[in-house]
Every structure is written in C-alpha cells, then in structure tokens.
C-alpha cells in the first residue's frame, strides 16, 4: 500500500510541476510574441507584412497540423509506455516518422507545383516584390517541413511527461524569433527575404534540438523498418477527424488573409 501511495504522490508532484512549467511557458511566450509582432510590423512595413501573412500562412498551418499529429503519436506512445511494450514504442516512433516524411514529400510536391502559380496569379503582389515573394514561399515551405518532422520527437517528450524540455525549447524558439525580428532593417538585405530565410534556419535548429534530446533520452527514438500496416491505419484513423477540423480552421483563417 505504501508503494502505491508513493507512486500516487510522485505522479501528483509530476503533474503539478508540469502544470507550473507549462503555465510559465505560456506567460513568457505571450509577452514575447506580442513584442515580436510589433517589431516585425515595424521592420517589414505594411506591404511586406501583408505579403508575409499571405504566403507564410503555411507556417501557421504547420503548427496546427503538427499539433494534431503529435497528439495522435503521444496517445500511442503513452498507451505502450503504460503496458511497458518497449519494442512497440520503437515501432510507433518509426511509423510516425514515416508518416511525417510521406506528408513532407506530398507537401513539397504540392507547393512546388501549385505555389509559384498561386503567388504570381491569385495573390495581389506588386511586381517589384514578386521575386522576394517567391523566395519567401520556398523558405516558408521548408519551415513547414522542419516543423512537421519534429512531431515524433515531441510526441516522445510529451508521452514521457518531460514538459521541462518542451518548455525550454519552445521558449528558446520564441526568443530566437524575437532576435530575428529585431534584426529586421539591420542586415542590409531585403527584409522579407531575410526574415523568411532566418525563420527557416531557426525551424531547422529547433528540429535538431528536439531530435537530439529525444534520441539521447529515449531508447525507442531509433528508426526501424516497420511493415505492419495496421499501425499505420490506426495512427491515421485516430488523427483523421481532428486533422480535418484543424485544417478547416486554418483554411478559414488563412483564406481570409489571402482574400484580403
């Protein structure tokens, strides 16, 4: 009985600690993001800021899509951790990574084919900013991809309830974006191109940090070939309706930006 009480006590402490950590993270991110938006608007100007919002909306979309997929991955991780199925954990990680890689290829093909046409014909962009807008599209696309590829690693961190790592990395992410915004107008380069390229590099760095933490902390975060089709179907079906709902919400928000 004492062991049971000890486990309950440890679990309660962990929940309380994670709650406080995530609350502190939310406060920091809220204030930093508010100031970052102010710097970006001042640095880009109204015209370039509008172009950025219309084209780089794919980055906003990636946040929504990745959260849905991360939730699905975390659910399968947590279930297997509870049952102490070590081999199953590695299979879930590998399948999740395969799905993210497949989605990445699909998005690259889609936006490389449709994206340039969309920017040049459907969006109202001054001809003098067209080249910068096309470059921004490429940078935004790969920022999206790097965010997508973080999912299996973030899912493992969530499932193991190590919210401190997540809070630290996401705070680092937010502060670096603030520094990037502060650099607008100070580099001597085209501000729109600089901002898109810097955000892409920052997304790559954050992805590498998550990968490094997960691979060092969790034995299951090692890739293995998985041919079990049932697991692929389960992951897809669990995230399906949430994914459609998130995609609809993003489409409504970003669709308004494009129309305006």
Where are the regions that the model predicts?
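Membrane-interface helix-loop junctions in multi-pass transport and translocation proteins
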Residues: 41-43, 47-48, 161-164, 175-208, ...
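Residue-level recognition of pore/gate-forming positions within transmembrane alpha-helices
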Residues: 26, 30, 57-60, 95, ...
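Signature of the first transmembrane helix
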Residues: 13-78, 108-112, 177-178, 240-260
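Alpha-helical transmembrane segments of multi-pass membrane proteins
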Residues: 125-150, 167, 171, 179, ...
């Amino acid at each position: 009985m004492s062991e049971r009480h000890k486990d309950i006590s440890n679990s309660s402490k962990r929940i309380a600690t994670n709650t406080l950590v995530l609350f502190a993270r939310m406060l920091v991110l809220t204030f930093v993001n508010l100031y970052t938006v102010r710097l970006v608007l001042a640095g880009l100007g109204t015209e370039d800021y509008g172009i950025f919002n219309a084209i780089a909306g794919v980055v906003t979309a990636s946040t929504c899509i990745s959260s849905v997929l991360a939730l699905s991955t975390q659910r399968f991780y947590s279930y297997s951790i509870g049952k102490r199925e070590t081999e199953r954990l590695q299979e879930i990680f590998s399948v999740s990574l395969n799905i993210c890689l497949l989605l990445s290829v699909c998005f690259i093909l889609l936006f490389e084919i449709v994206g340039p046409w969309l920017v040049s014909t459907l969006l109202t962009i001054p001809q003098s900013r067209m080249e910068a807008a096309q470059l921004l599209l490429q940078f935004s696309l790969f920022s999206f991809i790097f965010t997508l590829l973080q999912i299996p690693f973030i899912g493992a961190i969530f499932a193991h309830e190590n919210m401190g790592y997540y809070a630290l990395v996401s705070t680092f992410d937010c502060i670096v974006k603030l520094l990037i915004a502060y650099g607008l107008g100070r580099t001597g380069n085209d501000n729109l191109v600089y901002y898109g390229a810097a955000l892409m590099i920052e997304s790559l760095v954050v992805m590498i940090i998550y990968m490094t933490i997960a691979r060092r902390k969790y034995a299951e975060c090692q890739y293995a070939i998985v041919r079990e089709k049932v697991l692929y179907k389960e992951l897809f079906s669990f995230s399906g309706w949430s994914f459609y709902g998130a995609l609809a919400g993003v489409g409504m928000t970003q669709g308004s930006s494009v129309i305006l």
